[in-house]
């Protein structure tokens, strides 16, 4: 999994930061998958500065309906049609996302030429394709808001081909059955159990992408043990009370949660426009004083999960 930050500013864009949008690249030689988390104004323009084609998007997850996370969506949907894209797209979001999209398309005389599914979600598991699952957790914010936990399913361990050959099992279709954990019978009557020749399963990666939030009950469960946690750090420690009063978090709160949840890495984003580059480094230092494995997301930053 690969994260590409298209927008990292809170509320309004700045000269160097657009409003919130994050790509999750799941593409692999044997599988497709390009997901977008939030779609603030100008997101499709930010996409033009990357190597990713909007036509490859197959899922969009909206955390909540505040404009800095949403207002880029109608334009992106229409541009996909104007480009002749026919790949289906599914949008997940809180109650009201369907009305927003359908109203924006209707009153602007727009449409989509590709299958578009809109799923209004609640807390709980919202998606599982057998490779990975996505679970939504309620955030603490003035509007209904969700954070998303993305978990890969464990992958089967490697098959010990050498041991199988030594046992007289010929390479070929039988190996595929054994890799699936099945038991086969050889021509000489021996039974071979695939589980005996498989290494331990490879744990899947886990990622938590928080929506806008102040401290909340679901935060620890959402973030527990993930490899990477993406969390807002809208304001610094000195302005924590102001951040919380508006349903946001401070640097201290983001870093303390990362430490308590035992995450591998914290990436902070959704930075107030009051902070210039020097101010952003101040935010990063505050987080690292509590949780050293912290990175600051800038627009177009790329992180591997």
From Swiss-Prot:
The keyword Nuclease applies. Signal peptide: none annotated. It comes from the Bacteria. Zn(2+) 1 binds at residues 64, 66, 141, 212. Pfam families: Lactamase_B_2. The active site is at residue 68. One of its GO terms (molecular function) is zinc ion binding. The keyword Nuclease applies. Zn(2+) 2 binds at residues 68-69, 212, 270. It is an enzyme of class 3 (hydrolase). Keywords: Endonuclease, Exonuclease, Hydrolase, Metal-binding, Nuclease, tRNA processing, Zinc. Its EC number is 3.1.-.-. Its cofactor is Zn(2+). Binds 2 Zn(2+) ions. InterPro entries: Metallo-B-lactamas, RibonucZ/Hydroxyglut_hydro, Rnase_BN, RNase_Z/BN. SUPFAM superfamilies: Metallo-hydrolase/oxidoreductase. Homodimer. Zinc phosphodiesterase, which has both exoribonuclease and endoribonuclease activities. NCBIfam families: PRK00055.1-1 (NF000800), PRK00055.1-3 (NF000801), RNase_Z (TIGR02651), true_RNase_BN (TIGR02649). Belongs to the RNase Z family. RNase BN subfamily. HAMAP family: RNase_Z_BN. This is Ribonuclease BN. The lineage of its organism: Bacteria, Pseudomonadati, Pseudomonadota, Gammaproteobacteria, Enterobacterales.
